[in-house]
């Protein structure tokens, strides 16, 4: 039997476990869907109950609790937990057509951080772009409409070809003058963000263009 705690905050998962652990759990598979929490952290002492704990995390942004589940068939699932029955848990999702990968408990937090950067922090960057567009006279709706082809096209290219082959723009070209103009039109906080992101872009650009001199941008 597979029992799961879905859609609960990490603190509440522990509370649910505290209510469950004195039940008859022999041979049960207990699963949670947290990205950052390991099975051992969520279900302390589960081995004493004769049960097996697993973290089953979909790499998927659930932005709408009523409709997001319809797209879960495309999600990549990352599983962590007791190795004894791990393949049985994976088989559930393999049979549904989902790709599955195993991860060690020690890597859960960094893995979840990677997912958050890709999903949540991208939203923050897009908001920064929308704010700049509005300073140029766009309203938010028209700015979003104007930027949509860039956003969607770029993400599609990255998904198909990776970041190195998808990189374009003034940093990739080592266009120092344009980068300087960009910095001059930003406030101090925006400049900090631009510089930090540009450092990452430079490292990608060096992979794409090994012979190009990025020294003046560093």
Spans of features found by a protein language model:
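Single conserved hydrophobic/aromatic residue that forms the stacking wall/gate
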Residues: 1-12
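Flavin (primarily FAD) binding-site architecture
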Residues: 13-20
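Short, conserved loop/helix-junction motifs that constitute active-site signature segments
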Residues: 21-26, 45-50, 71
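N-terminal transmembrane hairpin
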Residues: 29-33
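Rossmann-fold NAD(P)-binding glycine/threonine-rich loop
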Residues: 34-63
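Internal alpha-helical scaffold of NAD(P)-dependent oxidoreductase catalytic cores
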Residues: 48-52, 67-159
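NAD(P)-dependent Rossmann-like dehydrogenase/reductase catalytic/cofactor-binding core
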Residues: 144-218
């Amino acid at each position: 039997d597979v029992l799961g705690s879905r859609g609960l905050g990490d603190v509440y998962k522990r509370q649910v476990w505290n209510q469950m652990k004195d039940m008859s759990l022999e041979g049960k598979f207990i699963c949670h869907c947290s990205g950052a929490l390991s099975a051992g952290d969520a279900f302390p002492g589960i081995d004493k109950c004769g049960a097996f704990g697993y973290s089953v995390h979909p790499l998927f942004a659930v932005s709408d609790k009523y409709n997001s589940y319809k797209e879960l068939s495309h999600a990549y699932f990352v599983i962590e937990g007791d190795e004894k029955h791990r393949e049985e848990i994976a088989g559930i999702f393999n049979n549904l057509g989902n790709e599955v990968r195993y991860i060690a408990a020690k890597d859960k937090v960094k893995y979840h951080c990677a997912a958050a950067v890709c999903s949540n922090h991208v939203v923050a960057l897009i908001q920064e772009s929308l704010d700049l567009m509005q300073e140029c006279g766009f309203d938010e709706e028209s700015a979003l409409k104007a930027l949509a082809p860039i956003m969607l096209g770029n993400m599609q290219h990255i998904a198909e070809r990776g970041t190195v082959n998808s990189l374009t723009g003034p940093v990739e070209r080592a266009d120092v003058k344009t980068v300087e103009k960009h910095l001059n039109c930003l406030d101090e906080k925006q400049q900090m963000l631009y510089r930090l992101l540009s450092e990452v872009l430079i490292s990608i650009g060096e992979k794409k263009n090994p012979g190009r001199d990025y020294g003046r941008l560093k």
